[in-house]
Amino acid sequence: GSSACFPALRPREIDGVKYIDGGWRDNMPLDLAAAMGAGELLAVDVNGVGITRPNTTGLPTRIIRSHWNLGPTLDFAPERAARNIALGYFDTMRLFDRMGGTAYGILPDSSAFLKNFAERYQLRLAEVAARSPAIDLVEKTARQLANYPAPFAPNPSAPTAAALAPLELAAEHLNVPADMPYTPKLLAATVMGSFEKDPADRFPALLDGKDGSLVAEKAMAAAAPEEFVTALVSRTLADVPLF
């Protein structure tokens, strides 16, 4: 275990045998589980220090990974531990299709909010692209850099993880807490309550066609694509009823 993490901590000795953290051989010993008779594998990748070997077992395998930085190896703060437990729970529920989203724990929701948001977001994005064709690449770059899925083709407004991605990306950019579950509508409302100055105000020429320096705004969007997507999400949510 981590109590034997070498060289940060000394090896542990049990019955005359010294032990160090297993991560120095394999962080996810899937081959060991297979050798012990497992017919299906469920692994957790915490992106920790050590070696993670490729899965060569040939067994059906699911791997739980976190979108978030889980903190330093030796950070034992109770607050971080509680946050990581919540994030791990959401990651597991998402893997088994009990929750949606990519980074946040998105609860099942029968309302039409996500569909309406996705349709309006794509319409807004198309309007901006008509003013600046390169903006599509900016939006896709924001998703890629922040590890969110690309727009779902052939229907980019379908209520999928890809359709939810811009909303999650904006939430992450605005530091919306990830250790609690949200419906899409609640996440949207939390996003809209997370700023004092509307991010969309930085892009009046791009988003609304108002007089301004389109060239400067295009450069700003390219330099900080996550800020542009956050602004576009804000402008989209202004058009979608939340209550």
Label each PLM-derived region with a short phrase.
Residues G1-F243:
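Patatin-like phospholipase
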